Amino acid sequence: MSEIKEARLQKASSLVSKGFASYAQSFRVSHTTSFLIQKFDYLENGQEENFSVSLAGRVMAKRVMGKIAFFTISDQDGQIQLYLEKRIINLNLEKQKLLSFEDIKEIVDIGDWIGVYGTIKKTNKGELSIKVEKWEMLSKSLQPLPDKWHGLTDIEKRYRQRYLDLIVNPHSKNVFKTRAKCISFIRKWLDNRNFLEIETPILQSEAGGAEARPFITHHNTLDIPLYLRIATELHLKRMVVGGFEKVYELGRIFRNEGISTRHNPEFTSVEIYEAYSDYVDMMNLTEELIKDILADACGSLTINYQNKEIDFSKPWLRISMKDIVKKYTGIDFHSFNGDFLAAKKAVKNINVDFSNKVNTIGRLLNEVFEQKVESKLIEPTFVIDYPVEISPLARPHFDNKEIVQRFELFIVGRELANAFSELIDPVDQRERMQLQQSLRDKGDLEAHCIDEDFLNALEIGMPPTGGLGIGIDRLIMLITNSASIRDVIPFPLLKPEISSKKSEKLPLNEVK
């Protein structure tokens, strides 16, 4: 045990020996720091206000100068100074069982949670303060906080011990406040437009709705494998079949894939479906929604992200994948007319690497786009008309069955949204799922399985529908100017630190 921890344990014991709790049951707070700072901004230096308050927070700074002490405490909204005089604190010790000025000098450490009662004053130096009359220990901290001058510089420690990051880094706290407000805003925005939020299963017997590798678990009682959902799409479409014309779900998605500054295996998305709409309607909805979120969260449609200024007020570019690939690479995929070898030769000339799985012109086009174009799309750009091979759930164009009515929105070089006119033809959908299943049987773990119940739902009849998915984490990265997705997820997935005791790994059918 460290000397600091031992000393703090002794202080906690000292409180108990004096008849006080070192870990209180409760404390009634009358106001927050932000309320008090705003309400009493008018006070002149040295002026006092006989306004009684009770306030609680974590001690972030402590200065004792003889018979006077200054503390800074932090609550969820901000920080405020405490002003303590020995004469005032000790005034009622004989009448009431209270902690003394000497107690607060000796027992309270930076990191402790305390509650105080007092009135308002502004010091001669202009610092709004609580003039403390009595105080209580709410929770004794046994470990010191990171040094306030150097902060928490170990980035991985910030992610592993987010509680420390939130204590010493106000920016991190603001990021998660902004995240919560944006999520609330999205729900209200959709609710006000008569969309209904639906809760779909997280545990599913078939993992569908996206090309992604799922997490697999096992249900002991039913003795069946289950999958954590990789999308909410197929169940939300079932709701549309059932007669709900405007539905959405904002929730967690799980994909057993890589980790990077843009990817976390557990992430948040909102999927939106509207009957009688198509992908053009979804483009309009996407642009309107994101502009409204930015205006609410940032107060402007011009933001700075990682030293790049982005103006969202300008019209957002809408361009086909073939045309934007031609713009940035010079390769005209319109000209190949089904000649895969010619396309393959042209692509190799610009140093695009691809696997044997890339065996059609459509997949080759997508590979060129991802490797040579995507990172260059800084301003909001709707890339439309995707190859049918990579879009098994999207409606084909009437005049060209090789491309589908799909778009993805790219901002600062990364995908932020994905949408399409939904495929509602059950015969076409079955053929595509059968093709996906054959790819899966050959080892492509990201290909779709055949979902017979979903196909049955389509055979019952689904109206024309537009569908949209927006990545919430990437949106929050943009709004908060965060470089990594780990900065906007409170508890991102990390590899466990090496422990001296190895954990026992249970077989799947024994996990409960």
UniProtKB/Swiss-Prot annotation:
Subcellular location: Cytoplasm
EC number: 6.1.1.6
CDD domains: LysRS_core (cd00775), LysRS_N (cd04322)
Entry GO CC: cytosol
Binding site for Mg(2+) 2: 415
Residues holding Mg(2+) 1: 408, 415
Record protein name field: Lysine--tRNA ligase
Gene: lysS
